[in-house]
Amino acid sequence: MKVILRKDVATLGDAGDVVIVKNGYANNYLIPQSIAIRATEGTLKALETERKQQARKVEMQRKHAREQAQKIEQLALKVFARAGESGKLFGTVTSADIAEALKAQGFEIDRRKITIEAPIKALGKFEAAVKLFSDVTVAVQFEVEAEGMEA
């Protein structure tokens, strides 16, 4: 029996795949558990239109991510942290601090999408990578300054 998988199944395939399985397996397990549906002409057409819509949606998200990347590259971010007289920070600058600085500039980016090469424990200029989409990553330049010493 031909079925369309609605969920990923390790032994059969990924969601959206059309696979052939034994009738008993489909009727007694896959279909009742909502893991798969019967592959009829109507469901195959619906699957195809859904894939096209999904592809358009992904392309729009990718385009939006590229536009955001261009804007973020132009930014001159400043991150403020408490520091001692010698310029050494009390603590470290984290991806959450960078996400907060980006939010202040109008970019809502999750801290888990920001990667910092090494811990930042001093004042100065640094760079972090921001992954906006699966294939869109942008380098963010930022400067760590001591709190209360705005220029």
UniProtKB/Swiss-Prot annotation:
Keyword DNA-binding applies: no
Its domain of life? Bacteria
Record's Gene Ontology CC terms? ribonucleoprotein complex; ribosome
Q: Which GO terms describe its molecular function?
A: rRNA binding; structural constituent of ribosome
Keywords noted in UniProt: Ribonucleoprotein, Ribosomal protein, RNA-binding, rRNA-binding
Key word Iron-sulfur present: no
GO term, biological process aspect, one: translation
- What job does this protein perform? Binds to the 23S rRNA.
Q: Which family does it belong to?
A: Belongs to the bacterial ribosomal protein bL9 family.
- Read off the NCBIfam families from this record: L9
Q: What's the protein name?
A: Large ribosomal subunit protein bL9
Q: Which gene encodes it?
A: rplI
